Swiss-Prot record:
SUPFAM superfamilies linked: Nucleic acid-binding proteins (SSF50249)
Family: Belongs to the eukaryotic ribosomal protein eS28 family.
Gene3D superfamilies found in the cross-reference section: Nucleic acid-binding proteins (2.40.50.140)
Annotated GO CC locations: cytosolic small ribosomal subunit
Record's keyword terms, sorted: Ribonucleoprotein, Ribosomal protein
Alphabetized InterPro entries for the sequence: NA-bd_OB-fold, Ribosomal_eS28, Ribosomal_eS28_CS
Presence of the UniProt keyword Translocase in the record: no
Any one biological process term the GO annotation gives: translation
One term of GO molecular function: structural constituent of ribosome
HAMAP family, alphabetized: Ribosomal_eS28
Protein name: Small ribosomal subunit protein eS28
TM regions (residue ranges): none
Length: 69
């Protein structure tokens, strides 16, 4: 079903990004679904630490570094 979220576990915190450092770039391991076991980079807003479970609406996109304009 397309409206279901996919769980992903944070395995590494890469660093802060964005104009004021408001986003954190993390590497997550997809826990279920067709991309199970794949590790991708995502940008996360809010507090996050290694071991947290994120619910991703989309697993195909990888994060790119957010630049300062």
């Amino acid at each position: 079903m397309p409206n279901e979220a996919t769980p992903a576990e944070v395995v590494e915190i890469i660093g802060r990004t964005g104009m004021t450092g408001e986003a954190t770039t993390v590497k997550v391991r997809i826990l279920s679904g067709r991309d199970q076991g794949r590790i991708i980079a995502r940008n996360v807003l809010g507090p996050v630490r290694v071991g947290d479970i994120l619910m991703l609406m989309e697993t195909a996109r990888e994060a790119k570094k957010l630049s300062i304009r």
